[in-house]
Amino acid sequence: MSDLRDVPERDGVPAATAPSPSRRGLLRLGGGLVAASAFGLSFGAGGAAAAVPAGKRFSLTEPSHDLFRHAKLHDARVQQSFTFDIVNRRLFVAQLKSGSPDDSGDLCITQLDFSGNKLGHMYLLGFGHGVSIGAQPVGADTYLWTEVDVNSNARGTRLARFKWNNGATLSRTSSALAKHQPIPGATEMTCAIDPVNNRMAIRYLTASGRRYGVYNVADIAAGVYDKPLSDVPHPTGLGTFQGYALYGSYVYQLTGNPYGPDNPNPGNSYVSSVDVNTGALVQRAFTRAGSTLTFREPEGMGIYRTAAGEVRLFLGFASGVAGDRRSNLFYKNVLI
């Protein structure tokens, strides 16, 4: 497979020109509606001691670039998340399974090439909403990480690791799954993998609130859960949560809603960066990536490193009409 191509996205604008987030775009976390402002945000109790080496972060006000637009997934519903295997140069996109109830936890994973052409698919039954997935290369194989064991809120309660197997259908009780419960008492959890540094961010919910924990991927895969590198509160008041990614010492979040009468173009999509050692919101910027798309719902984030060594922060957007939703990926590549 060829490497990711570089096609400029022309409609990115700095945050200074962006509209303020709408009241409709506020985020419900912990049962409370929190008023949003760009930096007047609330956090829970203090996080773990800093253990993730500090490094560069992506500039979120730089314009975005296209990878592809209007890619057709195996099923017809909106994408929820995506992930890259940067060793074997593979891309996987998650969506809810067509024909299944929204609360079933049934997912479809589509493998695409970097031009958006379909290469394969898997079905996962009883897993979750597909909020975030991760890919772990093992030689020439790819192992996927997803949420599993769907709850009454249509979210997974544990993590599952399994080998990508084109055309297969796995139930939540399949022997092909290795299940993990790294956070005791968590009622929801998903993960995102930093493929450059081989670390994993786990976004989880307990009775005390929602948080991010950062671990080494190898530790979680081995069932070693008592070595978190950091653990910080999840920021509130940023808008409707739509995905996250981990790179270095920062978690990146995507928020916003699809276009509609209450959210016309240019929409209310924002990208933010959070220091995983302190929980501090470092930057928040409005994004117009893919602003000309129809529907344009922000859906998913990911990290990729090209063969030449350039690291990219990807943003996903769903487009199209009901019954024919499409996948669209854009990226930022300026580190500061």
What does each model-found stretch correspond to?
Residues 1-21, 33-41:
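N-terminal secretory signal peptides
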Residues 23-31:
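N-terminal export leaders
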Residues 71-100:
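Beta-strand-rich domains and repeat architectures in extracellular enzymes and scaffolds
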Residues 76-87, 132-140, 185-197, 243-247, ...:
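Structural signature of eukaryotic scaffold interfaces centered on beta-propeller domains
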Residues 92-123:
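Beta-propeller domains
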Residues 106-114, 157-166, 214-217, 266-277, ...:
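Beta-propeller blade signature
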Residues 116-141:
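Blade-loop segments of beta-propeller domains
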Residues 236-273:
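Loop/turn-rich, solvent-exposed surfaces of beta-rich toroidal or solenoidal domains
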